[in-house]
Design a protein with these regions (language model features):
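Phosphate- and other anionic-substrate recognition elements at nucleic-acid/protein interfaces
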Residues: 1-153
Length: 153
């Protein structure tokens, strides 16, 4: 199982994804609960949307997000869980096939590839949450790399 994470300063979204892209579960929780989830489920691999510099000034929330990522990396190191970090432009470009991607374009690409988000459909659990969709998307990107022989499991 792959755990995709879209980190935030207070709450982080996660998506538990099987190797066949099946969405096993997702939520948006605080870092302490996310670390508890990692300890409980011990995923095969964790993929995190990384922070990327665009040469602009950033605020406190960006640094708080970096601290959250650091806490997650620390627990992964302690549990010997491999981690990959991917910036949003990298994974979004691959999934959507275009250079500049916003939340609605990413949502549409995921719906076209994996099915709808109405009740009973594959992506229903992600409906209404761009953060959970991003967590799923970063996991999908990593799985695409795995299936194309570009990364270790």
């Amino acid at each position: 199982m792959i755990l995709g994470i879209d980190p935030g300063p207070e709450l982080s979204a996660y998506a538990m994804v099987e190797l066949d892209y099946f969405l096993h579960g997702s939520d948006k929780i605080n870092t302490k609960l996310l670390i508890s989830l990692i300890n409980t489920h011990t995923p095969q691999h964790i993929v995190i949307e990384s922070i990327q510099s665009y040469g602009m000034m950033v605020g406190r929330s960006t640094f708080d997000t970096c601290y959250s990522i650091g806490r997650i990396l620390q627990v992964c190191d302690q549990l010997s869980i491999p981690v990959s970090l991917y910036p949003r432009p990298e994974y979004a470009r691959r999934i959507c096939g275009v250079g500049k991607v916003n939340d609605s374009v990413l949502r549409q690409a995921l719906l076209l590839r994996f099915g709808g988000d109405k009740k009973g459909e594959p992506l229903h659990e992600l409906k209404g949450s761009s953060d959970k969709r991003s967590a799923y998307a970063v996991a999908v990107y990593h799985l695409d790399l795995l299936h194309n022989g570009r990364r270790d499991k």
